[in-house]
């Protein structure tokens, strides 16, 4: 399913003709350039590789420089892949713009969530706190028991405990596209999308639409 790589600009609001305020996230989509076309014969699956934005020449290593030169496209800030469905065809060097979503109403947006550092179980996993009084003096935000006794005699993998929170890949599904601004290469998406301002986001047609 083909999508676009964008950059989260921030949030604002737009008004409908009835005067209703809609909170929107602005996503800037610089032209996505196709840097490679993968086929069943050569790669075992069909996909396109795209790059977006630009990168300083002194930040492009030799492997990247050769790859982009072969494709005849400007070096971008990263490489992403989109799987192709039957019958879809693209050429190396082709550009994908926001007009791809002119007929799309709902999208899934993937980004890297804001990093929040080391957090306890209450903030990280929404554990309820223990009693604030009634003899409790040190364990207000402690997680409580983390297992049983001699059997099994260990803590199970995946146990929800304190640890690093955020800075992970997150997808928010079924967000509504409020406006497609082809002139300024902007997508206005209703509500919040994952990640910090300036972060890369992947916008795809919604799978559950």
Curated annotation (Swiss-Prot):
Which GO terms of the molecular function aspect are on file?
Answer: rRNA binding; structural constituent of ribosome
- The yes or no answer to whether the keyword Cell membrane is present is no
Gene3D superfamilies named among the record's database cross-references? 3.30.160.810, Translation factors (2.40.30.10)
User: Which Gene Ontology cellular component annotation is one that this UniProt entry carries?
Assistant: cytosolic large ribosomal subunit
Chain's role: One of the primary rRNA binding proteins, it binds directly near the 3'-end of the 23S rRNA, where it nucleates assembly of the 50S subunit.
**According to the UniProt entry, which residues carry N5-methylglutamine?**
150
Say yes or no: keyword RNA-binding present.
yes
Q: Which family is it part of? A: Belongs to the universal ribosomal protein uL3 family.
Q: Which domain of life is it from?
A: Bacteria
Q: Supply the alphabetized keyword list.
A: Methylation, Ribonucleoprotein, Ribosomal protein, RNA-binding, rRNA-binding
Q: How does it assemble?
A: Part of the 50S ribosomal subunit. Forms a cluster with proteins L14 and L19.
Q: How is it modified after translation?
A: Methylated by PrmB.
Q: What is the name of the protein in this document?
A: Large ribosomal subunit protein uL3
Instruction: Give any single GO term for biological process.
Output: translation
**Record-linked PROSITE patterns:** RIBOSOMAL_L3 (PS00474)
